Curated annotation (Swiss-Prot):
Encoding gene (name): alt
Reaction equation(s) it catalyzes: L-arginyl-[protein] + NAD(+) = N(omega)-(ADP-D-ribosyl)-L-arginyl-[protein] + nicotinamide + H(+)
Gene Ontology process terms (BP): regulation of viral transcription
Protein name: NAD(+)--arginine ADP-ribosyltransferase
Purpose: ADP-ribosyltransferase that efficiently ADP-ribosylates one of the two alpha subunits of host RNA polymerase RPOA on an arginine located in the C-terminal region. ADP-ribosylation of RPOA alpha subunit enhances the transcription of viral early genes. Also ribosylates RPOA subunits beta, beta' and sigma 70 and performs an autoribosylation reaction.
The organism's taxonomic lineage, starting at the top: Viruses, Duplodnaviria, Heunggongvirae, Uroviricota, Caudoviricetes
InterPro entries, A to Z: ADP-ribosyltransferase, Phage_T4_Alt-like
Residue ranges annotated for the TR mART core domain, each copy included: 375-628
Taxonomic superkingdom: Viruses
GO molecular function: NAD+-protein-arginine ADP-ribosyltransferase activity; nucleotidyltransferase activity
Similarity section: Belongs to the Tevenvirinae NAD(+)--arginine ADP-ribosyltransferase family.
Subcellular location field: Virion
């Protein structure tokens, strides 16, 4: 049976592996992407300094290495191993691929994996057999397994690899043969060992195996990860991967350099900064926007809804203008706060005409029972109000952002070099799909849109150069983009409260997520809770809704379910950006954020709605750019707390702690930001249906 298993095993089935501490000279803590679950197994490489639990990182010159499996939780913490995923054998294959590379590169003589048999899905022996085959086929005969250790312990499965031409007892870190277990007897054929309990003679390898197991049975996995260092960026990278991708050499090249572009801004403030701030903050621009919207709204309420006579249009228009202006007067017109206050005011205004609407609606009744008619009336009113609010927010999103579009049209992009301009034009034109697909691990050289790999490499290099040259937008500006995200990646985002963008991030200075490029279809998320609760359909802020007809497909493949996200991102002033102006499509008011960007999630709002067509799983996410200065790449955390409670606590005392952002704000499910309760209305106005793909790709 074992021979059959090894024949069926595919040696090339390795899984994606992420180095969770890229700062280490010797990579030694990894996550393994086994499936689309939000918790993934990982492993740490380490060594022991004595016969007890005292362990440390691998260093140059070490000869004995230990592999300790663990689970990487969705919160980014390390916990005791819960399982190896659906294919423990593929996990082991991936682990030993890394182990063999490490042993060869750093001249390590022995390596041991100890794993609880209860976590192997009944495949402990198969795992040992597979490891034996891997070592024999990949080491060129230089390494062998100590098979005498396989069946020593009922609780653990042991796998020990050692260099063939080195005696085990001579390797530093391998325990001496235990005098508690064995008596050494000299004989004519050499030393023999007698088991003190049974009196039976055993081979030297059997005595070594028993001594190794005796020492390691006392060790706890908990002690190994008490002082482990992990990278927030690497965790986010591993959790933002889709299961189907093409990890080419170029993908790996650019993945390894992405953090370079998430550093604090070095570019000078753009010349248009003051004009930009004035355009969205001046009373004149707000009055102009309020007047335009009020006139259009008054006419709509007269002609479409027949709420009042034509002679009252001007009076109603003035009233609407005053209501809007009073709501938004203290907020920048492109900010979420402004849109939120505007939405609340418009909602309240429309409610004043509910009796008028009901009078017209009740005239259409055709003898339905009161209970039935009441439900019909409720649904019809909600749909009518939803449709109205979405149109209103759509209008304000475009008109209030008018100054941003005018400024962008006038910008010439002359600060960039010819090659940088070429890269920007290629990205803003038709090349962004292939460029970002390569960075996302989706690019297939046999099926691409317009650019070959060589052309993409040139474009990315030119864009990277443009970011180094770069622009810096003023503080207090919110940029917007949309994204269609698979359910597993979204769930990791919710748990971890951080998201990693592998690709260049196309955003707009205008609130394009509320329908600027199409008919608004998701607009109720900015309302106060009571009003929003009436209009949303999911009734679920952060969770995912699985419709009955999707349950089977979701169980078979969680990536089947997509979540539509509207991003409102603050803090873009913290990093170098590219502001293309006339080098791109100026009416889009595009600002490109760098690849490798990390954002902290501050607020997730349910944006689902039904205005005649149901839109499930639509979310408004408010986030903030985090630079490498704010987000520590490697911090020491208390492993005891991580494993026992899931709480992330930085180590103190004699251990040097690097400057860092408070990680509790990333993992807490109760992250709160002071926002107006009307946020719900705006969220449901998110519309990404007809948006240019570069503002959605990710």
């Amino acid at each position: 049976m074992m021979e059959l298993i090894t024949e069926l095993f595919d040696e090339d089935t390795t899984l994606p592996i992420t180095n969770l501490n890229p700062k280490k000279k010797i990579p030694q803590i990894f996550s393994v992407h086994v499936d689309d679950a939000i918790e993934q197994p990982g492993f740490r490489l380490c060594t022991y300094t004595s016969g007890g639990d005292t362990n440390r990182d691998l260093k140059m010159g070490d000869k004995m290495m230990h592999i300790v499996p663990f689970t990487l939780t969705a919160k980014g913490s390390i916990a005791k191993l819960k399982g190896l995923g659906p294919s423990p054998i593929n996990y082991i294959n991936s682990v030993f691929t890394v182990a063999m590379q490490t042993m060869r590169q750093y001249k390590i003589d022995a390596c041991m994996l100890r794993i609880l048999k209860s976590k192997t899905a009944g495949q402990a022996r198969q795992i040992q057999v597979i490891a034996d085959r891997l070592i024999r086929s990949r080491s060129g005969g230089r390494y062998v397994l100590l098979k005498e250790l396989w069946d020593y312990d009922k609780k653990y499965a042991y796998i020990l690899i050692h260099r063939k031409n080195v005696s085990l007892e001579d390797i530093p870190g391998v325990p001496e043969i235990s005098t508690e277990l064995f008596t050494k007897v000299e004989s004519k054929v050499g030393d023999v060992y007698i088991n003190k309990d049974t009196g039976a003679q055993v081979t030297k390898n059997e005595a070594i195996a028993a001594s190794i197991a005796q020492e390691n049975d006392k060790r706890s996995d908990q002690a190994v990860i008490v002082k482990v260092k992990i990278s927030r960026r690497a965790i986010a990278q591993s959790q933002s991967l889709e299961s189907s991708r093409f990890e080419s050499e170029l993908f790996q090249k650019y993945e390894s350099t992405a953090a370079n572009f998430n550093k604090p801004a070095t570019a000078p403030l753009i010349p248009e900064a003051e004009e930009m701030k004035l355009g969205i903050n001046s009373l004149a621009s707000k009055t102009k926007a309020a007047k335009i919207i009020a006139e259009g709204t008054a006419n709509e309420l007269h002609y479409d809804y027949k709420f009042f006579s034509k002679s009252e249009v001007n009076e109603v228009s003035e009233k609407i203008k005053d209501v809007i202006l009073n709501a938004i007067k203290n907020e920048p017109t492109t900010s979420i706060k402004c849109l939120e206050k505007y939405a609340a005011a418009v909602n309240q205004f429309f409610e004043e005409y509910k009796d008028n609407w009901l009078d017209k609606h009740n005239k259409t009744r055709k003898g339905q029972p009161d209970e039935v008619w009441g439900e019909i009336t409720k649904n019809a009113w909600n749909a009518a109000k939803t449709k109205f609010l979405k149109r209103m927010i759509y209008s304000f999103s475009g008109i209030g952002a008018g100054p941003m579009i005018d400024i962008t049209i006038a910008r010439d992009g002359s600060k960039y070099t010819p090659s940088q301009k070429r890269g920007i034009r290629e990205y803003c034109g038709s090349g962004y799909t292939d460029i970002n697909n390569l960075l996302l691990g989706r690019y297939n050289p046999e099926r691409y849109d317009v650019m070959s790999e060589k052309e993409i490499e040139s474009a990315i290099n030119n864009l990277d150069s443009a970011f180094e040259n770069g622009d810096r937008i003023p503080e207090g500006i919110t940029v917007y983009r949309a994204q269609s995200m698979t359910a597993p990646i979204y769930e990791a985002l919710v748990k971890n409260k951080v998201f990693y963008f592998r690709n260049f991030v196309s955003t707009s200075l205008t609130p394009i997520i509320f329908g600027r490029f199409g008919i608004t279809h998701a607009g109720i998320g900015l309302l106060e809770p009571e009003a929003r609760n009436e209009l949303t359909v999911d009734k679920n802020e952060e969770g995912i809704t699985i419709n009955p007809n999707e349950i089977r497909a979701y169980k078979e493949n969680p990536e089947y379910v997509k979540v539509q996200i509207g991003w409102a991102i603050d803090g873009a002033h913290k990093v170098n950006v590219v502001y293309p102006g006339s080098l791109g499509i100026a009416t889009e008011a595009e600002v490109i954020l760098p690849r490798g960007l990390m954002v902290k999630v501050n607020k997730i709002t349910d944006a689902s709605n039904n205005d005649g067509t149901t839109s499930n799983n639509t979310k408004l996410i408010q986030a903030e750019v985090m630079t490498t200065e704010e987000l520590t790449e490697s911090v020491i955390y208390d492993g005891d707390c991580l494993m026992e409670t899931g709480e992330v606590v930085a180590m103190t005392g004699d251990i040097e702690i690097e400057d860092r952002v408070d990680f509790a704000s990333f993992v807490s499910s109760n992250v709160k930001q002071k926002v107006e309760s009307s946020l719900g209305i705006i969220a449901s106005c998110i519309d990404i249906t007809n948006m240019p793909y570069k503002f959605v790709q990710g």
